[in-house]
Amino acid sequence: MSKDSVETNTIINTIDNTNDNTTNITKKNSVEEIITLNDFSTALGDESKGLVIIDFFTTWCGPCKRIAPDYIRMAEKYPTVSFYKINAENENLANIVAACEIVSLPTFCFFKAGKYIGRFVNADPVGLEKSIVESSQ
């Protein structure tokens, strides 16, 4: 997992500068899909959640499709971690995608206590799981 230049404050300011009060988080298996900015705020807002992972994907991305079953399996294996996904083409979340500096797919962003702590960019399930274990400690 890499720590990069994404600033938690930039992400939070992006959320704060919206008037979206709608919550539409949809749960598929043990991974919840974030659809609105309010969903994103809700996902990160509870600092007691511990580790939160967000998978940025698109429906046409081959590597995203390949790792999706592994991501679901990891969500079931690590129940103390909160697993989410965001379609990077969702226009409602374009500001979040930009603030998180998503330039390659899939990208998994890691947050702890509401703060950005790093990312894993690859469709490698072994590497992703290693990053989850390391970030959980």
From Swiss-Prot:
S-S bridge residues: 61-64
Active site: 61 (nucleophile), 64 (nucleophile)
Site note Deprotonates C-terminal active site Cys, residues: 55
Keyword Disulfide bond: yes
PROSITE patterns named in the record: THIOREDOXIN_1, THIOREDOXIN_2
Record keywords: Disulfide bond, Electron transport, Redox-active center, Transport
CDD domains noted in UniProt: TRX_family
Entry keyword Isomerase: no
SUPFAM superfamilies the UniProt entry points to: Thioredoxin-like
InterPro entries, per database record: Thioredoxin-like_sf (IPR036249), Thioredoxin_CS (IPR017937), Thioredoxin_domain (IPR013766)
Annotated site residue numbers, Contributes to redox potential value: 62-63
Ranges for domain Thioredoxin: 2-137
Domain of life: Viruses
Primary role: Participates in various redox reactions through the reversible oxidation of its active center dithiol to a disulfide and catalyzes dithiol-disulfide exchange reactions.
Name by which UniProt lists this protein: Thioredoxin-like protein R548
Organism: Acanthamoeba polyphaga mimivirus
